A protein has these predicted regions:
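ATP-dependent helicase/translocase motor core
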Residues: 2-253
Length: 253
């Protein structure tokens, strides 16, 4: 894993094999809307077909465009967290954009709705400013988390500090993907030893918090036999159920 490419690949493989994710196609990303329209459409058709049909009866062949554009408008005005929790309106229909974990598994319908969430890991998409984040995690077509990954054992020798610099200098905080609250809500700077996070990109003023477990009463993470020290980020924190819980219960902006 002594290169950033293989580090990135290993994280993707973990998320898509045991983490409950689907591998995303960067070509499916629409930089104008900062959405994955195909996933938006697939999720709504799968979980809210009756509402889709009602909108279709009014919009016909423009149904997909109308729904996706109304979603983009809601995200721009209400913010991603509000839309995930409260939904958005389109042609008089209240559309949900996420189904969170039920308190009990007794209700089969609610469990099926929860299982229908489309969670994807997409590498190397291109934004409208031709930025190429290492990895973007999305829920039902809405990008929510970005990761910049560095491997200090690679030829470049870049580490988590370089990832933080990349967020500060090379990511447009006013761009569609990165603008505060409107799409992505968490940004992780990661290497094989440490993780830092922020919820708001603000150029040189971006403030990162450590997202480490600590080691010997100090910073960092304990060594892990057969894996890198930061593996908990993708095997625990970002695994499907934990990912959903972050946006259902724990995030406040």
């Amino acid at each position: 894993m002594h290169s950033e490419y293989y580090f990135e690949q290993a994280i993707e493989q973990s998320l898509t094999t045991v983490g409950g994710y689907v591998k995303g196609n960067p070509k499916d990303y629409d930089p104008r809307l900062a959405l994955f329209p195909k996933d938006v459409v697939a999720f709504i058709q799968e979980t809210q077909l009756k509402k889709w049909v009602k909108i279709y009866n009014s919009c016909k062949d423009e149904t997909e465009n109308r729904i996706v554009n109304d979603l983009a408008h809601a995200l721009d005005t209400e913010g991603a967290l509000s839309v995930l929790r409260q939904g958005f309106k389109c042609f008089g229909q209240k559309i949900k954009m996420a189904y969170f974990a039920p308190n009990t598994s007794i209700n089969k319908t609610i469990q099926e709705q929860y299982d229908a969430n489309i969670i994807k890991c997409t590498r190397q998409l291109h934004t409208e400013f031709n930025e190429i984040p290492d990895m973007v995690l999305s829920l039902n077509g809405i990008p929510l988390i970005t990761l910049e990954l560095k491997n200090e054992f690679s030829a470049s020798g870049w580490n988590v500090e370089d990832a933080k610099i990349q967020f500060k200098k090379d990511r447009n905080a006013k761009g569609r993907l990165f603008e505060f609250k409107k799409r992505t809500l968490v940004h992780f700077a990661v290497d094989t030893c440490e993780v830092y996070m922020t919820t708001k990109l603000d150029g040189e003023n971006t403030f990162f918090l450590p997202f480490n477990k600590g080691y010997l009463n100090g910073r960092g993470n304990p060594p892990v036999e057969g894996d890198v020290r930061t593996h908990y980020l993708w095997t625990e924190t970002l695994a499907r159920h934990s990912f959903m819980e972050i946006f259902a219960r724990y995030m406040h902006l």
